[in-house]
Amino acid sequence: DACHGSYSSKKWVNEIMGLTLNALGGNAFIWKFKHNIIHHTYTNVDGIDDDIAKSPLMRQCSTQKWMPAHRLQHIYILPIYAISSFAWAVLLDFIKYFKGKVQATVLQKMSVKENIVFWSSKILYLIFYIVFPVYFVGWQSWAIGFSCMQVVLGLTLAIVFQLAHVVEQTDFEVAGIEDKLIDNEWAIHQIKTTADFAAKNKVISWLVGGLNFQIEHHLFP
């Protein structure tokens, strides 16, 4: 909510609370660019929306090249989802940082402050999530606890966002990589490329903070 600018009416409060994403291993600056600007504008547009980025291991829409391994992706995809949050923290953010791009879109220039926040939070992540726990409880206990945390987080994030966009009833639209022109106006595009799920399940709604109402979220983020 803070990274969406909706936690508080005060920008500085949202900025501070948004840093809790850094505490989980992500980076608020890169995520806001990747999610708020790109994903919320070019939802399900192959080559632009990083949430459906093409991969040799996972094919998420018909415009992505089919590979023989994809016939088994329904089997091996769960372990990939399970490590996705850890990959986000230690790999994917760095790829975007050093390439200066999110898919085909040039990443907004980071200020000196944002560069300091990026590196300091990544270092603190390693210290508080790996170094300190291994030192105080031993590597075996750490490995079990850390793995359980990452599996739960990775599966939760993947399931929520895949059910909201990568399902049969959503469209996967095409846009020019350079001009980024989509067929429909923004609101129609959001409705066509997004899906609600478990809308009548109060437990799910509570657990995911209302993100199962994904159409509403995209129209009124």
Protein language model features and the residues they cover:
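Membrane-embedded catalytic scaffold of the fatty acid hydroxylase/desaturase
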Residues: 1-110, 177-221
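Membrane-interfacial segments
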Residues: 2, 6, 96-99, 136, ...
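Hydrophobic positions within alpha-helical membrane elements
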Residues: 5-9, 127, 155, 170
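Alpha-helical bilayer-embedded segments of polytopic membrane proteins, i.e.
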Residues: 22-26, 72-86, 109-160
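Active-site proximal loops enriched in glycine and acidic residues that flank catalytic Cys/His/Asp
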Residues: 131, 146-150, 159-164, 174, ...
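Active/binding-pocket-proximal capping segment
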Residues: 149-154, 161-187
